[in-house]
Swiss-Prot record:
Record's protein name: Small ribosomal subunit protein uS17
Subunit structure: Part of the 30S ribosomal subunit.
Disulfide links within the chain: none
Keyword Aminoacyl-tRNA synthetase annotated: no
Recorded GO CC terms: cytosolic small ribosomal subunit
Cited function: One of the primary rRNA binding proteins, it binds specifically to the 5'-end of 16S ribosomal RNA.
């Protein structure tokens, strides 16, 4: 049989806060076209990610992958650090 892996979202963003052990907040930016004015607008969203080894620092650009909920707000884990100290 052919088993499929569940599709998991991958987000990339900048670490803006390292508030607790094994946790960090990343800011993800996306660009959308405004419905009425047809102008490209930046939209931002914050995600709390799980950092098992405490390796990220504020200013790093990281990639995070969706996982099962780890707490009330954490449902992403650190995948890799793309750029150190942006």
């Amino acid at each position: 049989m052919n088993t499929k892996e569940p599709h998991k979202r991958v987000v990339q963003g900048k670490v803006i806060s390292k508030f607790a052990e094994k946790s960090a907040v990343i800011l993800v930016e996306r660009k959308v076209v405004h419905k009425k004015y047809r102008k490209i607008v930046k939209k931002f969203k914050k995600y709390t990610i799980h950092d098992q080894d405490n390796q990220v620092k504020v200013g790093d650009f990281v990639s995070a992958i969706e996982c099962k909920p780890l707490s009330k707000t954490k449902s992403f884990t650190l995948k890799e650090i793309l750029v150190v100290g942006v």
